[in-house]
Amino acid sequence: GRYCREAGIPFAIDASQSAGKIPVDMEKQFVDVVAFTGHKSLLGPTGIGGLYVREGIEIRHTRAGGTGVRSAIRTHLGEYPFRLEYGTHNTVGIAGLHAGVRWILGRGLDSIHEYEMNLVRTLRDGLASIPGVVLYCQDDLADHIAVLAFNVEGMDAADVGTMLDVDHDIACRTGLHCAPLVHEQLGTIKIRGSVRFGIGPFNTEEHIAKAIDAVAEIASLRRH
């Protein structure tokens, strides 16, 4: 961010995965634009997100339409936030996002992070003890959030995810996780990516124990 600021280049970050997990200080990190979605760690519903734009940054709108503000004007409004907004707002989504953010602020980001990381450490240790399970994480989980990716040797990631869902009623995410270049480096393209567990503030130790047992059962079926 600092290098971009010194070179006069706007610096934008995609906080879709990190908003609600990691605090963003736009001044200290020299951030000009932050894009985020509401339905992940901000605990809002789907269909809602936002764009935070630092004062002085000009973004050209790509769509135009009514805003309900100064409707007699025949051109799209040029000032923020109307420049980037048009049509009827998703008021239900906004209310849901507000409720999620309010809950997070009440609980505290640090408190949530500590709780989730304690769970993911237990999950990591449990999965690491299972023969045939390959983990994609640092040993000490430094600079980590409560997301853990893994594979079972000899098994397709999608098949593992299906068994977790159908046989164990456990939700997970399988695939390339919008990061195909990472999976090219990991060599996991042919097995369709990896299996990913995302731990949230409403997960419990019982959930973690169930997930470990389920993966152990699935791994026992692997091809040798």
Annotate each predicted stretch with a short phrase.
Residues Q29-I73:
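Active-site PLP attachment segment
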Residues V92-G93, L97-H144:
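Conserved PLP-dependent catalytic core of the aminotransferase class-I/II
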Residues L77-T91:
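A short glycine-threonine-serine/GTX helix/turn-capping micro-motif
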Residues V166-D167, H183-H224:
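PLP-dependent enzyme catalytic core of the Aspartate aminotransferase-like
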Residues G1-D32:
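Catalytic PLP-binding core of fold-type I/II PLP enzymes
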Residues A12-D14, A35, R60, Y136, ...:
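Structural detector of well-ordered beta-strand residues that form the stable sheet scaffold
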Residues M117, R121, G132-P180, Q185-L186:
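Conserved PLP-binding catalytic core of the aspartate aminotransferase-like
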